[in-house]
Amino acid sequence: MQITTQTIDEVLYPKIEAHTTGFLEVSNLHTIAWERSGNPDGIPVIVIHGGPGGGSQPSYRRYFDPTKFDIIQFDQRGCGQSTPYAELEDNNTHASVSDLEKLREHFGIEKWHVFGGSWGSTLSLIYAQNHPSRVLSLTLRGIFMCRKSELHWFYQDGASHVFPDAFEPYRDHIPLPEQGDLIKAYYARLTSDDVCLLYTSPSPRDNTG
């Protein structure tokens, strides 16, 4: 059976809109955006997006039966509609775990299902390790553990052989002497105070989910 976009569309639940949206201040600097869809009285499930640096997508709602689940989504610090956008200060894994607990407490939820994809699968596991009594179940998809070997495959030497046409512009933007460590090279540019350098850096698409 050939899997197509149409095939995937047929097996997912219908598209729905969020019925409630809001923001939660989680630190003196960061405020995270959240939304809820599905059944307000249903089984709570928190959806943890990928990246790091991605954002929650409307399509994620379609993994769940909207008549049975209270679907909770949020944008992690610096992502999506959360503010300040793209802020790295006070933005780390432990802060994200803390934010999940603040969201849970904000909604008055005792326990919830945890659903994470890509980087979100890593964050889901860390959250579950730190707060096992708050987790009804774990669902992990597109598992990405953020290990050095995985980062190297995705950003340096691995995906480059599978999708060479997509990889070449990302690689070739960096001067040849720096191409041995593309993550380091891009980090230096994207955190630079040189505005000209910052805005000439392309934004490679994050397809990790």
Positions of the model-derived regions?
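A catalytic-pocket lid/entrance helix-loop region that shapes and gates access to the active site
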Residues: 136-182
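Single conserved hydrophobic/aromatic residue that forms the stacking wall/gate
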Residues: 199-209
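Conserved hydrolase catalytic core segment
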Residues: 111-149
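Catalytic nucleophile-loop/oxyanion-hole region of alpha/beta-hydrolase
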Residues: 85-96, 149-157
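Conserved HGGG/HGGXW glycine-rich cap/lid loop of the alpha/beta-hydrolase fold
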Residues: 29-84
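Conserved acidic catalytic loop of the alpha/beta-hydrolase fold
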Residues: 97-111
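Conserved alpha/beta-hydrolase catalytic His-Asp/Glu region
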Residues: 177-201
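N-terminal cap/lid segment of alpha/beta-hydrolase-fold proteins
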Residues: 10-31
